Amino acid sequence: MVSARVVRRVSVLAAIVAILLGIPVQATAAPRPTSGVDDINCQPSAAHPRPVVLVHGTWSNPTKTWEKLAPALRDQGYCVYTISYGKRENASLQNLLDLFGGDSIRESARMLGKFVDTVRAETGAAQVDIVGHSQGAVVARQYMKFDGGTNPANPAANKVNTLVSLAGTNHGTSFNRNQFIGAVGEMLGIPVVRLAALAVGPSYVEQMIGSPFMTALNAGGDTQPGVRYVAVGTRDDNMVTPQERTFLTAGPGATVRNLWVQDGCPTAQVDHMQMTSDPRAVGIVLGALDPAWGRTHPAPCP
């Protein structure tokens, strides 16, 4: 049993390590409910029969991430549900800063699976749509591939109909040169990977280009049969680098639409974190979930 004193001391060390590694950690407040969101009494309508599950990214939380998009979806008549995931597990000596989205992506995907089953049971819906930001898109893809979110032998039994990936780290990222800096540290004998997991959890390293996790996730193709994918990137992304690594390639039985926020609006300036709140990005999500609505309601262009 590790004493609380040891955990506190190591947590201080973890915070120092995070700063030295250049990891952009921000304090995350406990999630607060948004009116009309996460309503167990919400009944999907004929117009929007699938609940929408929102999956935040690394070191964020539902309140911070979805303060604009969740109400916009609610106002369009969707049943909207948000998950918070990836905090430090009891007695674990990883993610000592206890950040949301820090835990292993495999564990977070299993948590998402349980959450989706709860949403389906509460609403009576056979399927959900998922919007995932950054790591959230990868958590969703892991769930769909390995944890029961889809049924390749019988796609009609899929639990997920549509995945909208917002700046997803789908093919790994260099984190704007942090991966290179970490590799140099490892060559110099500094255990950067272990220190990063200690400080902020394993998900950070799992999202890097060429990681064992990314290799396994993308082996055999990016998609699952019967799922509609919309991958939205931004040319201003400083977290998913190179930015094109967010896009997906359709495999058998799946459809993929890849687009930039700047498509049709080259003046749009939207960074990684703004992908869930910028009015144009929000409009793109609404149109992705309801293409018929999107054809008559183009996303605003500043």
PLM region descriptions:
Residues 1-29:
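Secretory targeting and sorting signals
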Residues 32, 38-41, 45-127, 181, ...:
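Active-site catalytic motif of lipid deacylating hydrolases and related acyltransferases
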Residues 44-48, 73-75, 122-123, 131-132, ...:
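Extracellular/periplasmic catalytic domains that process cell-envelope and extracellular macromolecules
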Residues 56, 80, 98-100, 106-215:
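Serine-dependent carboxylesterase/thioesterase catalytic core
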Residues 57-61, 86-90, 133-138, 145-146, ...:
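Solvent-exposed loop/turn segments at secondary-structure junctions
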Residues 67, 92-95, 172-179, 241-245, ...:
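Short aromatic-enriched loop/helix-cap "lid" or pocket-rim segments at secondary-structure transitions
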Residues 186, 222-302:
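C-terminal catalytic-base region of ester-bond hydrolases, centering on the histidine
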Residues 200-238:
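The feature captures the conserved acid-bearing segment of alpha/beta-hydrolase catalytic domains
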